[in-house]
Amino acid sequence: MQARGHARALAICLLCMAGARAFAGQLTIDPAAHYPEGPLWIDGQLLYVEYSASNIKRWDGKRVSLYWHKDGCGANALIRFRGHLLVACYDSNTVVELDASGKELRVIRTDSRGKTFAGPNDFAADGHGGIYFSASGVYDIKAPITGAVLHISADGLTITEVANTIHYSNGLTLAKDGRHLLVAEMLAGRVLSFDIAADGTLGARTVWARLQDLAPPTPHEDAYNGPDGVKLGPDGNYYIAQNGSSRVLVADENRKLVRIIQVPTPYVTNIAFGPRGADTVFVTGAFEQWKAPFPGAVYLWTR
């Protein structure tokens, strides 16, 4: 068993070296971020959140500055929506809408039936002007499984729970075919695929990939290891931030590993793409996720 495991790891390593043109450079954008998450390339600049500081930071290509702060938010993700910006506030269980200047326009506290959110975590565009977002539930492997996915209509007026009983729903992305939504089920160590109906609701779910089947485990993994951010890249591949393994797994549409991006931080949280598509990859991660002040860093890989 051990010999076969080493052989598989070597085969995957060779695959990663041969699979694509290597990254030529790595830049540390912010070496002292406080649990960074949710990177978003927008209007020629990078925005990202600091979860443990409830900040949004901005990098203009030269320097980092504070864009927005709200005590108690626990900012976890960002997405553009109707010319504005949505912020997932994990700690306050809300979604905040900001205008282009960072002014708060509204705070969304419940879905259209009056149900509150449990830990808004990440966003994905639905391809028709609306937004999906995950509400993770409790980050505890022994807690009841209450993770959900919600949908915000294109006009921003209707918010509907479209999936539930997910073991800590986390990153999500529209699939390449536009007919499926991929959702990270973090505490189950896998990525789910949901059928998307014409009205944006979600139907049948299947297991799209188990991380243990994509790549061999790393020595320091624990029970909380799993997929965090998930993004469909401009190159048609899926980028999966593996929290707890210091890496981003890159898989094709057939769920075959294309390459591994090794990251200095153990707790890799999310991915975004810059002005040159898959040739500019932003990655956020934390060195420590169990003890304040939760130090982390923001990186840029270029080809």
Located regions from the model:
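A short beta-strand motif characteristic of beta-propeller blades
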Residues: G25-D30, R63-H69, L105-R113, T158-A163, ...
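Beta-rich, blade/repeat-based domains predominating
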Residues: D30-Q45, Y51, K70-C89, T94, ...
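Flexible "stalk/tail and boundary" regions
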Residues: D43, W59-G61, F81-R82, D99-S101, ...
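Beta-propeller domains
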Residues: L47-L66
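Short, solvent-exposed loop/turn segments at conserved positions within beta-propeller repeat blades
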Residues: Y51-S52, Y90-D91, D140-G147, M186-L187, ...
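A short loop-to-beta-strand structural motif that recurs across blades of beta-propeller domains
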Residues: N55-K57, T94-V96, G147-L150, R190-L192, ...
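Hydrophobic alpha-helical segments and helix pairs
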Residues: G102-I159
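Short loop/turn segments immediately following beta-strands, especially the blade-tip
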Residues: F194-T201, F294-L300
